[in-house]
Amino acid sequence: MSRIKKARKPGMSSQPVVVTRNRTDRDVESRELKRKRKRKGLKAGARNAESNAEQARRNAQKKDPRIGSKKPIQLVVDAKQKTTKQERRLTNEQELAMLENDAQLMVLLDRLDSGENLGTGLQKYVDEKLARIEHLMGRLGLLDDEEPEEIEEFPEFAERKAKSDDDLLAEFDDFNMDDFK
């Protein structure tokens, strides 16, 4: 048999059938996985370095939080002073304002004004708070009723302040020590 040479002229043979494939996501993923399986290990050369995102992720895991702190550190340790009772204690004005704005006390006072009888515990609470308010107002000078009595308690001291030096000398000369025996 003699050999027949193939010719490349159009129309000689039937037209090649063009097959178009619709590639799905699954096909694309399977090809990528196959490519990764073939290429195990690291890429050759320094120019094929890891991506920056992966490097940052690895460095973040290894980073020690104690290293690189910008917070200033005191070289001399000062002993912390505990706050004293006076520093923790409220001033008279603050305590008075707090008692005057006490919601529970106001409700109980309204109940008393309406003629309702309170229990012994609540009545005791109201009495204590009102006594404390009165005491604080007296300390702050907001109550004028009690102050004149305290001043008049020692009238001889008030008179001595008004005397002159000559009067005091005369009183000293007339002083009798036998009165105190």
Swiss-Prot record:
Residues 22-32, 55-67 have a biased composition (Basic and acidic residues). The keyword Metal-binding does not apply. Keywords: GTPase activation, Ribosome biogenesis. Pfam families: YihI (PF04220). InterPro entries: YihI. GO terms for molecular function: GTPase activator activity. It comes from the Bacteria. Residues 33-42 have a biased composition (Basic residues). Residues 1-73 are annotated as: Disordered. One of its GO terms (biological process) is ribosome biogenesis. Coiled coil: none annotated. NCBIfam families: PRK05244.1-1 (NF003560). Belongs to the YihI family. A GTPase-activating protein (GAP) that modifies Der/EngA GTPase function. May play a role in ribosome biogenesis. Interacts with Der. This is Der GTPase-activating protein YihI. The lineage of its organism: Bacteria, Pseudomonadati, Pseudomonadota, Gammaproteobacteria, Vibrionales.
